[in-house]
């Protein structure tokens, strides 16, 4: 009898040990990144950190972007104010930071990786109208915070990095900070790491008061950072790090200097040199091999430079074409040339400069304004055989320009001229979003570049080509189609228009074939 009891107790002991180990293995590690100001580079920090953690540890890494604004998503946001709207594979229209995440991590994100106040409120109000709260008074705490946590826990990954957009202490972000405080309690401190990014202004010397005050705001909410990343114009002195360590209660080794770099692709190397990802790995006690780190930017000597002109509607906004800019940089790396982008407002084009550049790109842009300059840029590219790529609306304008100046037919898009007698492009009613399959003609440049008859590309447009006029395209060919025209070419020169957005799928290690071949032709 005693032996049986011992055997039973032994079995229960090992069974419980097994359960604990399984729970430990499956528990995600959560890293929350907040900021004392908007625009400090939280997205870049998250992307660099995620990439390093993915490289150095045998763990999956995902990122969530929290935007405190009341918009449900970024679809109606003005690019002049907010930058580009980045489209995911599933058609979700998101903040441009998700594009940075995809490029740095080389993964495809979904709608679950983006959380906004508007999205959370919409879910809560829909649930309330359906009676799912059983007559309870619906409140920010616990219902809003619970919904935020529910969305966070939907992401299944070994490591989950959460970027809290906006500014700590603002009315909009306060409730999210409360939700993240609750997250820390639910998962345990050993599975939670707080990173706070603060700006250090320079007035004769670096000032640390702004950092001290923003950390104090976090503490008032019951949440304090484990790491402080300091954004500054120039390299920090050791005494400044020590001062921040003493006043903010963070180890001096966890005070990170993130001073200005030539471009964002140098940031990951700078952070690695300061043992930032290494210290986070040690904080979580994760097995890692630090020798596996490789910078995102290839270490090559590039001496050749080429000028590529982007003629667009939003060129005065530095982030309106961020994915396009990055795609050209990646293509330059692959072809070993420095791509110098000439930004040209479509309302004020410089024809002399257009004749001197190595390639011209007309990107997308909703609305009927600022058209004439784009049409003229397309005409110059076509007539002078300057390599040309028209993206989305740029493709539509390439067709309109060709009809006008080659076929001598004054057609238009109903977006530009609703009462046009020759509607070359008409409204599809619903916005076409996300990944779509496209079939390529085998005797085309597109097929040569993609090396495949079937491709998938991301879309964001409402207007499509009117196939009634297809047979009039004398000298211009439609070489890619879905249920509408997707790609147009002019044989004999590098002239291509695409209805989709190739820039959303270009990565540092997987340069999109259109940008790769455009830069190869231009150099």
Predicted segments, located by residue:
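C-terminal and late-domain segments of enzyme folds
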Residues: 326, 442-523
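Short, flexible, solvent-exposed loop/turn segments with mixed acidic/basic and small polar residues
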Residues: 216-221, 426-429, 447-453
